[in-house]
Amino acid sequence: VSEALKWVLDDIDFFSKKFNIQAGLILTITRGEYAPEHLRSLLGAYKSLGCPAGVIGLDLAGNEDITPPPETASLFRSAKDKYGLGITIHAGETGNADNIRNAIISYGADRIGHGTAVIRSPEIMDLIRELDICIEVCPISNRLTGAVSDVDPHPVGEMINHNIPFVICSDNPAIHRSSLSEDYVAFMQETKNFIVMDNMYETQKRYSFLKGV
């Protein structure tokens, strides 16, 4: 695992310099009974490499109906506190707003992946605003996966109305065969909100796990 992680970080460093960009790696595990074991393995590799600055965060993804062992959350929080890693959790994509609350309270999430269910709970919207948690909105993916039906407006419109922090993201671009630019287009088709789009780059920098952007 350490060797594979080093290869990835070396490539990120090489191409960051080649194209004069800043980039970092978020280590992702999926929900399931082996989630703690997988996270320990990744964190062990991270520590064995001297806690490289190229690793900037941790992510929990996968089926929200699967509850990982309770220790998973404490491992995420511990890594956040000890190493200063950003935490993003896929939650609220399948309609359960309580998963968003759990991601924030139990895992210490700084960002929420998808989070389309947030508009169903005024309480959770208040929590999001109070703690300044950012939603990673993926317009194209949400339609393709059925997280948002073809006949319903995308929840991002209500997020804007309720002052919920969010950024536009791509999700599995190789699988969905779409780019971030196309997600921008989808967002504009949904909202026609030029003000939000004009400020999107600054919003993305604000909530990025990269230091000093």
Descriptions of predicted regions:
Residues 35-158:
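Catalytic core of soluble alpha/beta enzymes
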Residues 23-25, 87, 135, 166:
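Hydrophobic/aromatic residues located in beta-strands of well-ordered beta-sheets
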Residues 1-27, 36:
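Active-site loop-helix segments enriched in His/Asp/Glu that coordinate
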Residues 149-161, 175-177, 183:
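Flexible glycine/proline-rich, aromatic-decorated loop/lid segments
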Residues 130, 181-183, 190-213:
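Mid-to-C-terminal alpha-helical segments outside catalytic/metal-binding sites
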Residues 88-94, 164-180:
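Short acidic/histidine-rich active-site segments
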Residues 139-145, 167-169, 185-190:
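Short beta-alpha connecting loops at secondary-structure transitions
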Residues 14-21, 50-53, 82-85, 192-196:
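Short helix-capping segments at alpha-helix termini
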